[in-house]
Amino acid sequence: MSKRMVSLFLSAVMFVVCSFGATATYAAENIESAIIDGKEYRCESRIVDDKEYMYITNITDEITDVVYYDVCSGIIFLNGKPVAYVENAVSFPDEKSIESVSPLATTGWRYHDTSNHRISWARGVAAATLAGIIAAVIPSTGWLSVLTKIGATALSAVSAACIGGNVKCVAYTQVLASGKVQCRYDWTFRPSSGESYGPYSSYKL
């Protein structure tokens, strides 16, 4: 299982944390590719000094953007400069809602929590970069998944039209026959321009 740029959920507990560990060696974690407006893009997740970075490369034009989400400060950096800010709000189930089942899932799923992430970005950022910013706040969801589900055309329009939006993520869990806990995340992206994209689903063991 590959690490993501930011781990907002740990196992079935799934709490946002600030981690401080020993210096890690450079490692390539995951590589995804896509064609956007006739240009080839590659997204590579790397770990440098225990921090996860997303390298988004426009191979056609030989341009690379580096995205890093600092979980503790809530700031997303693009090429070393703050380009987006994340405000997180997490709600946990009460006695009535704890039995809720995901509308996108079969029976057996139990509601865990709902998180809302208000994100902002610099107007006109590339669609590929905006996909990376959105993916940064969704557990177990890669850059390519966001790009393909929302669509490059829609992301380009959103980037040009506004500078902020909301990412809502509803988490569910179920216990498999093996005894392992599987997590499901149903997420929706709503830019301030009014459109709604989703819900889409991602999974994690």
What residue spans do the PLM features occupy?
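Sec-dependent N-terminal signal peptides of Gram-positive bacterial secreted proteins and lipoproteins
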Residues: 2-26
